[in-house]
């Protein structure tokens, strides 16, 4: 009982029962998130090897691994809200807002912090800021960006789906990319 009360308080809001296309999109969103998390987990070992082989020292290696974990945590923590649904039978168009870490504002905050510190080398600042960023992302204490996206859904074999391009844009937004791709923020 105590645990359930704590969980309700920590969520901050009650989750309403989803229905119709909202529920169908929720399934898709969570499948995209699961796929991304699986890819992150599958590549974790490879990333660790790459970090060890491509850096000059342990600090750089740790910074690279922290970057990877920061992106992973931001992606896992991404959420959405449905703003509008246009149901057209076997097709639907949803206006959604994806909420995730605003890396631009977070970086600006860290740079302001750096300016106030005297006698801190760039390397020390990089290490400190990566660790601070990771802590903030894990605790959900970061600036948040809300980005609108139009999602085209279609029904195939009685199952609602989105196409690969839409899925890639959605994943990009879940990572915080304002352009909706994993390679340009």
Tell what function each PLM region has.
Residues 7-10:
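C-terminal motif of bacterial Sec signal peptides marking the signal peptidase cleavage site
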Residues 118-125, 141-183:
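Short beta-strand edge/turn micro-motifs at domain boundaries
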Residues 60-61, 102-145:
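Mixed-charge, low-complexity intrinsically disordered segments
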Residues 87-91, 157:
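Residue-level signal for tight coil/turn positions that link beta-strands
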Residues 13-82:
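Core segments of small alpha/beta cavity-forming domains
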Residues 90-100:
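A short hydrophobic beta-strand element
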Residues 98-104, 155:
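Beta-strand elements of well-folded, non-transmembrane domains
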Residues 1-3:
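Sec-dependent N-terminal signal peptides
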């Amino acid at each position: 009982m105590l645990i359930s009360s704590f969980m309700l308080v920590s969520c901050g809001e009650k989750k309403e029962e989803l229905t119709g296309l909202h529920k169908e999109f929720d399934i898709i969103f969570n499948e995209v998130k699961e796929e991304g998390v699986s890819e992150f987990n599958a590549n974790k070992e490879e990333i660790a090897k790459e970090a060890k082989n491509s850096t000059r020292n342990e600090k750089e290696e740790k910074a690279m691994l922290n970057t990877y974990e920061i992106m992973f945590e931001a992606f896992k923590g991404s959420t959405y809200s449905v703003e509008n649904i246009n149901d057209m039978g076997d097709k639907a168009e949803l206006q959604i807002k994806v909420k995730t870490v605003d890396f631009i504002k977070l970086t600006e905050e860290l740079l302001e912090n750096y300016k106030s510190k005297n006698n801190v080398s760039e390397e020390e600042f990089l290490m400190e800021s990566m660790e601070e960023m990771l802590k903030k992302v894990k605790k959900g204490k970061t600036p948040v960006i809300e980005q609108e996206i139009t999602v085209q859904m279609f029904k195939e074999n009685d199952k609602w789906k989105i196409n690969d391009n839409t899925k890639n844009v959605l994943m990009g937004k879940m990572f915080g990319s304002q352009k909706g791709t994993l390679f340009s923020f």
